[in-house]
Curated annotation (Swiss-Prot):
One term under GO cellular component: cytoplasm
Role this protein plays: This protein binds to 23S rRNA in the presence of protein L20.
Name of the protein in question: Large ribosomal subunit protein bL21
Organism: Anaeromyxobacter sp. (strain K)
HAMAP family according to UniProt: Ribosomal_bL21
Family per similarity comment: Belongs to the bacterial ribosomal protein bL21 family.
Assembly, per entry: Part of the 50S ribosomal subunit. Contacts protein L20.
Pfam families assigned: Ribosomal_L21p
Regions that span the bilayer: none
One GO MF term: structural constituent of ribosome
Keyword rRNA-binding: yes
NCBIfam families (UniProt xref): L21 (TIGR00061)
Length: 101
């Protein structure tokens, strides 16, 4: 069974046992999180929510709080002017523990 969840303005297709890197969530390593479920599928026909499904839960456990590799943004004009900026986007790695429909 799989589900499509919404978090951080994005949608992810997950199943039990998956590890997903999502936008940073508040919480400590080992903490529990619940997600909004948009769609559930697997056996037979998929159920689609409007916008979410009532009575369907996806639970996860926070495995890590970390940052992605550095992203460099470099701009150069014809006259010799340059600008270099970079950042590391924080993320939360979550282990999906249960998908209940």
């Amino acid at each position: 069974m799989y589900a499509v969840i919404r978090t951080g303005g994005k949608q992810y297709r997950v199943a039990q046992g998956d590890r997903v890197k999502i936008e940073k969530l508040a919480g400590d390593v080992g903490g529990k999180v619940n997600f909004d479920v948009l769609l559930v599928g697997g056996e037979g026909e998929a159920k689609v929510g409007t916008p979410t499904l009532a009575g369907v839960t996806v639970e996860g456990e926070i495995v890590a709080q970390d940052k992605h590799k550095k992203v460099i943004h470099f701009r150069k004009k014809k006259e010799g002017w340059t600008k270099k900026r970079g950042h590391r986007q924080p993320y939360t790695e979550v282990l999906i523990t249960t998908v209940r429909a």
